[in-house]
UniProtKB/Swiss-Prot annotation:
Protein name as it appears in the record: Phosphoribosylformylglycinamidine synthase subunit PurL
EC number(s) recorded for this UniProt protein: 6.3.5.3
UniProt catalytic activity: N(2)-formyl-N(1)-(5-phospho-beta-D-ribosyl)glycinamide + L-glutamine + ATP + H2O = 2-formamido-N(1)-(5-O-phospho-beta-D-ribosyl)acetamidine + L-glutamate + ADP + phosphate + H(+)
Residues annotated for substrate binding in this entry: S99, H100, N101, H102, R121, Q245, E317, S318, Q319, S540
Residues annotated as the enzyme's active site: H54, H100
Gene: purL
């Protein structure tokens, strides 16, 4: 029980207690001006979380405004729990990606698990049924015992939550680089389906309507989680372990069903997840978005610990809780609905007209703050930006092609690089078939999930090559979006829209802010050219350990529409005799490549270049060919270059190989990472029809020899590799490193 006396308003100011909560002197002065008096301890807490970068985006808003956020299919853009895109037939797809990086660095199992739980709540709070989960993970090198521990625990946490709740984890990506050693990135994405008339908003309309708290009880976990996520990790972060929340997937499963049932009733006015900043953000945001106020009686909050103060209740980030507004007089039916699922639903306040958030506890008013001041009026900072010193140096480097002596050994070594190697060790822990809608399981370019009751499906992917973005943030930003779209197209989908998770270092450092600005410029341009608007996302700053920032990692989560299940395409070769085509030119581009990192132990120079108009044209041609039934397999050429893409297409097949002839200098032809390229196979009898639609070069054919042989133009053999040997190297790499 906490008997600690809270400091009074004068002490808060004189002893600068607000600074410990993350507020600056200027911000505290603004609060004093807004209120016309000094704030008390609880009110200072409300402002400190709502004005943190994590909740207010005060450092990133000017940059985020550059994203294109509208389109003919967009039903809901940024600003609600998740974005929504129309997919026809009165149906829509709802999706969002969020980070849980800081909690996962401290307490990896619960950090990752509650990241999954939180993103699921964002989806069903919109009225949608969650149908798929994905993730994008970054770790240091697996040789480090600490990294092994983080990797194993994060994957176990994602699996533990997703498997228990019964939503399939259908895809994702995992990359390894030394810069993530002390600060892993854990980005979780959830996708849901909804009928247009069921869309709900997090808005508290109707004065006199009742504010209800539903779900799990409130404890002291996660207090100041939003503030913790707005500072750099350090040795003292370990002491902040209590700030990591604990998840209960079985409770959340019940919460999903109860909320989706409630959404079908006309008693519900508005609903929002209690995520970052818990009760504070949900109440202030719902009131502010509706232009209303809210009064809450905190004695009625279900509490699982004794003696909790208003400050603790308002700032707790306990999991599996929602705030709802219901029509006055309908409270009892809501209570009964939740009781049926064994969940609490408690009336704890009402909507008012005066735009104030008022909190009462033990008969006294303990806070009175304008809702807009918390939700909308955080100061916006235009941070200084300065080109990173390394950028000019990398741009001026004369790039040489790495010297490779043995092409086969190099290919086998690349297949064992953890970023390229099979992630089966990861996804075998996930239930990716639950609910039986998964058409394409993890391991191909994109996951594909059918839309029940139709012939349609969703193609879903997460992508980001942060090495390219480090070398050249603007070009790398373009590539991140383009690669996501490439993966969707290779799976037979038409790219619809993206959600993003912008993971960066400390924005107060001008060179980091420059990375943020430039990568968003690149992403925005790619989104416009490829017609994939940004419908929501998340910003995670301060990803640094001991002053070293992670690579700039703006992860892209993209959803595409497969108009007919018969268009679904995968990367593995299908039958001997099929012709192999390469779309796109190969240049000697090795900056940020797997080959460069493997040979030199670091990355440098220029990232691969990209022409977005060319990218868009190629994607359109390939999608047309797939929809016309002319394509057997399609795979985008990414890390490791053409040799790896061809190897992966053979590894995924059974008993098939390939014989291929590549033009140009051998090392570049095999391993360069030029953009906008695809490996496509076509039935011989469809050669003419395919070549009418698609500009591509035929480079060889699929064989039944179980070997991949690659020749140069003079017909000299560059490499011959047995497919079983390649599969063993590729599949065994990560388990071997974990021993």
């Amino acid at each position: 029980m906490s008997l600690m006396l809270e400091p009074n308003p004068t002490q808060i100011k004189e002893e600068r207690i607000y600074a410990e909560m993350g507020l600056t002197d200027e911000e505290f002065a603004m609060i004093e001006k807004i209120l016309g008096r000094l704030p008390n301890y609880t009110e200072t807490g409300l402002f400190s979380v709502m004005w943190s970068e994590h909740c207010s985006y005060k450092n990133s808003k000017p940059v985020l405004r550059k994203f294109p956020t509208t389109g003919e299919r967009v039903l809901q853009g940024p600003g609600e729990g998740a974005g929504i895109v129309d997919i026809g037939d009165n149906q829509a797809v709802v999706f969002k990606m969020e980070s849980h990086n800081h909690p996962s660095a401290i307490e990896p199992y619960q950090g990752a698990a509650t990241g999954v739980g939180g993103i699921i709540r964002d989806i069903f709070s919109m009225g949608a049924r969650p149908v798929a989960l994905l993730n994008s993970l970054r770790f240091g090198e697996l040789q480090s015992p600490r990294v092994k521990y983080l990797f194993e625990e994060v994957v176990a946490g994602i699996a533990g939550y997703g498997n228990c709740i019964g939503i399939p984890t259908v895809g994702g990506e995992v990359q390894f680089d030394p810069c993530y050693e002390g600060n892993p990135l854990v980005n979780a994405m959830c996708v849901g389906l909804i009928h247009h008339e069921d869309i709900k908003k997090g808005q508290a309309h109707g004065a006199g309507n009742t504010v209800m708290y539903v779900g799990a009880s409130t404890g002291r976990d996660g207090i100041h989680g939003a503030t913790f996520a707005s500072e750099e990790l350090s040795e003292s972060s370990e002491a902040k372990r209590p700030a990591v929340q604990v998840g209960d997937p079985f409770m959340e499963k019940l919460l999903i069903e109860a909320c989706l049932e409630l959404i079908q009733s006309d008693a519900l006015v508005g609903i929002q997840d209690m995520g970052a900043a818990g009760l504070t953000s949900s109440s202030a945001e719902m009131a502010s978005k509706a232009g209303m106020g809210i009064e809450m009686y905190l004695d009625d909050v279900p509490q699982r610990e004794t003696g909790m103060t208003p400050y603790e209740m308002m700032l707790s980030e306990s999991q599996e809780r929602m705030l709802i507004v219901v029509k006055k007089g309908r409270e009892q039916e809501v209570v009964e609905l939740f009781e049926k699922y064994g969940l609490a639903a408690v009336a704890m306040g009402k909507v008012t007209e005066d735009k104030m958030l008022r909190l009462f506890h033990k008969g006294e008013m303990v806070a009175e703050v304008p809702a807009d001041a918390l939700a909308e009026e955080a100061p916006i900072y235009h941070k200084p930006s300065k080109e990173a010193a390394y950028f000019r140096e990398f741009q001026e480097m004369k790039m040489k092609t790495p010297k490779v002596d043995n092409y086969k050994e190099t290919l086998l070594a690349l297949l064992q690089q953890p970023t390229i190697a099979s992630k089966e060790w990861v996804y075998d822990q996930y239930d990716y078939q639950v609910r039986t809608s998964t058409v394409v399981t993890p391991g191909s370019d994109a996951a594909v999930v059918r839309v029940r009751g139709t012939e349609k499906a969703l193609a879903i992917t997460t992508d980001c090559n942060s090495r390219y973005i480090y070398l050249d943030p603007e070009t790398g930003g373009k590539i991140a979006v383009a690669e996501a779209a490439r993966n969707i197209v290779c799976s037979g989908g038409e790219p619809l829209a993206i959600t993003d998770c912008l993971n960066f270092g400390n924005p107060e450092k001008p060179e980091i802010f420059w990375q943020i600005e430039k990568s968003v410029d690149g992403m925005s341009e790619a989104c416009r050219t490829l017609q994939t608007p940004v419908i929501g996302g998340n910003v995670s700053m301060y990803n640094e350990r001991s002053g070293e920032a992670v690579y700039p990692t703006p992860t892209v989560g993209m959803v595409g529409l497969v108009h007919d299940l018969k268009h679904v395409t995968t990367q593995e070769f299908k039958q001997a005799g099929d012709l192999i085509y390469v779309m796109g030119e190969t240049k000697a581009e090795f900056g940020g490549s797997e080959l460069q990192k493997m040979m030199y132990g670091k990355i440098f120079g220029q990232s691969p270049s990209i022409d977005l108009e060319v990218e868009a044209k190629r994607q359109k041609q390939l999608l047309e060919a797939i929809q016309a039934g002319l394509v057997q397999s399609a795979h985008d050429v990414a890390e490791g270059g053409l040799a790896v893409a061809i190897a992966e297409s053979a590894i995924g097949a059974k008993g098939l190989g390939a014989t291929v002839k590549l033009a140009g200098e051998a090392t570049a032809a095999l391993f360069a990472e030029s953009q906008s390229r695809f490996v496509v196979t076509v039935k011989r009898e469809q050669q003419e029809a395919f070549e009418k639609v698609v500009e591509a070069i035929q480079v060889g054919e699929v064989t039944n020899t179980n070997e991949v042989t690659i020749h140069n133009e003079e017909n000299e053999v560059l490499l011959t590799a047995n497919v079983d040997e390649m599969r063993k190297a590729w599949k065994g790499a990560i388990p071997c490193l974990l021993k």
